[in-house]
Amino acid sequence: MCDEEVTALVVDNGSGMCKAGFAGDDAPRAVFPSIVGRPRHQGVMVGMGQKDSYVGDEAQSKRGILTLKYPIEHGIVTNWDDMEKIWHHTFYNELRVAPEEHPVLLTEAPLNPKANREKMTQIMFETFNSPAMYVAIQAVLSLYASGRTTGIVLDSGDGVTHTVPIYEGYALPHAILRLDLAGRDLTDYLMKILTERGYSFTTTAEREIVRDIKEKLCYVALDFDQEMGTAASSSSLEKSYELPDGQVITIGNERFRCPESMFQPAFLGMESAGIHETTFNSIMKCDVDIRKDLYANTVMSGGTTMFPGIADRMQKEITSMAPSTMKIKIIAPPERKYSVWIGGSILASLSTFQQMWISKQEYDESGPSIVHRKCF
């Protein structure tokens, strides 16, 4: 560990995308879908030296003949064999490093079950022979990336949304709230409302097209009802999108109706509070003395917070719920898609962090439960 040449690896395993790279870099080297695909029929591709599984972009490009599975659901690993394949792919194919030579910083969802983080630790030391590892909470890393140690993070990715209040670098578990509504649900909802317009999207391959439409054309309205009125009375909000086969489709109020479900989950038939209320409820679960710091440092992170207009809408909604004299500031850094990874890169390269790693020796002495004592 004393060697200067040994760079730590930072791997942020999201439900939708895996971000990986080297500590000290300002962006991840590899970003690929967290999917493992297996051939639907054995021996379809004659003479192609068919593999029994494909990971990431390769699985994505061959999706026509594969069954795709996401090993991470709602931010939590549910299939460890596939997860191992993703890590193997990360180290050997994407980063091209020997995992036994580098410490690894992994990320986990807030409120991750204890058994999950033990299993992660076990796989790193026993399967990949890591010299050292650490597990950090995703939202805390996003806050570090914004240069803060106190604030509340609204982290919304592909599989899950969390609001995590953090004080002096420590997450406050009693006030963390989780919302099972994220990017994947928005894509599904957009597929549904485009079908109502007469465009049919059903297969997993077509779902990727809809995800692209969502990322390129959707935005959050500041005033939903007013925007609906504008969309009904003029075509100024309409945009066209060219499908891979050359057909051009027009999309109107769907552009803001889709992300509106983040604020009104009833659109998806869910009874939960929207992201603005969830953030507010999370702040209200904290000690009254730190609320002021949380309102003034509300940080957005994750790909699902990338919609244009989301920060202004959030500002408006929280201002209407908070005490009238409260200063409210929503921080939405442009690189928030990768904030978690960037925070990990910062953390793993701090000199003060070097004594925090769990070493192979400590693991051999204590077993997987060491992770609860050293990572909190």
From Swiss-Prot:
Tell me the CDD domains matching this sequence: ASKHA_NBD_actin
Q: Which InterPro entries match?
A: Actin (IPR004000), Actin/actin-like_CS (IPR020902), Actin_CS (IPR004001), ATPase_NBD (IPR043129)
Identify the keywords attached in UniProt to this record, alphabetized: Acetylation, ATP-binding, Cytoplasm, Cytoskeleton, Hydrolase, Nucleotide-binding
Protein name, per record: Actin-1
Task: Fetch the Gene3D superfamilies from UniProt.
Answer: 3.30.420.40, Actin, Chain A, domain 4
Give the pro-peptide residues: 1-2
Query: Which top class of enzyme applies to this chain?
Result: hydrolase
Gene Ontology terms, cellular component aspect? cytoplasm; cytoskeleton
Q: What family is this protein classified in?
A: Belongs to the actin family.
Annotated GO MF terms: ATP binding; hydrolase activity
Coiled coil residues, start to end? none
Q: What gene does the UniProt entry assign to this protein?
A: ACT1
The main location is: cytoplasm
Point out residues bearing the modification N-acetylaspartate: 3
Record field: catalytic activity: ATP + H2O = ADP + phosphate + H(+)
- Its Enzyme Commission number? 3.6.4.-
Q: What does this protein do?
A: Actins are highly conserved proteins that are involved in various types of cell motility and are ubiquitously expressed in all eukaryotic cells.
**Where in or outside the cell?**
Cytoplasm, Cytoskeleton
